Amino acid sequence: EIRQPNGELHIPHIATAARELLDAGVRQRVVIHCPEGAWGEAPDLPGVWIPSQYLAQEEIVGSVGAGDAFCAGFLYGCHERWSLTDSVRLAHACARASLLCANAIDGAKTLAELKAEMVDA
């Protein structure tokens, strides 16, 4: 379970799941994400928790495409050989942009705009 009975995240369980995926044969990077943040790990790097920027429920306009936006941002960072942490930060920025719009298209921003939204952990 990634959540404790009180609803809070159980980050050690998330870390264990990521390590199990690596041990099962994932050769590059594993990222497990949820609204609060993402755990990232690679065979040659220790795991790290990278929190997302908080959005109040009333700020969220729509959630269609937010998970896909997260994945797209992460994959872009990987393709461009960004660090694991920066790839996840870009993924968070992409998901946040999507959540602030009513549909999956209006949240699309330029890379420069997304970089400005990347939050240091």
Question: Predicted segment positions?
Answer:
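Conserved phosphate-binding/catalytic region of the ribokinase-like
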Residues: 2-121
